[in-house]
Amino acid sequence: MAGAALSGEGRAMVQTSQEFYQLRKYTLTTGPQLALTQSYFEHALIPALNQMSIGPVGAFKLDIGPETPTYYLLIPATSVETLAMLETRLAADTQFRKAATAFWEAPAAAPPCVRVETTLLSAFAGWPKLVAPKTEKRIFQLRTYESATDAAHIRKVEMFNEAEIAIFVRTGLAPVFFGDTLIGHRMPSLTYMLTFEDVADLNKKWAVFASDPAWKELSKRPGNTDPEIVSNISNLYLSPLSFSQI
């Protein structure tokens, strides 16, 4: 069961102001798949999504993390229905199908990618809409927190909404989105993305956050400590592809 279904975020998710996200992971092999997939994103998929009034769409390359080469797509929408019907609408779009031919109709002996995995997320009440960075020079950090139980997961989401997001912003961290996993393979879990100028900027800002008195007090409260509510954290470093809209 998705954590959001049990929490305040679940009750709020019917609000049209709160976004939903598809986070797509494209696992690739080095070689022709890289250029083919990038071309598919740039010339077929992202233009088709924009024609559906979906965007901005983020397109990223995994720089630090397991399973390289890997690309990620972040697709925002104002409703679950929009994301659920995405493949059906794309399949019926003749202009998209023509532009996507090389990717969609690649032979089985030369597939365009190894595998595509999709996670469906609902935006946190405390950060209901994606915020795209305005700087040209940027990297991204994609973090996923898994919890041992639904109750622990709900408490971690509440912790973000009640105080942790505000501490992030006050100490200079720049969130792009926060999402509660509704459908995915690592549940219960949440995922969020931050943006920085470079790795040095990332390390500097995390150090400020870690030393913040309000964060130290919040994270030490009974019920808020990592051993109680977080069972695993994954941490990926991404860079935007040249045509990324985020």
Where do the PLM segments sit?
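Short S/T/G/P-rich N-terminal loop/turn motif that feeds into the first structured element of a domain
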Residues: 1-97, 102-215, 225-246
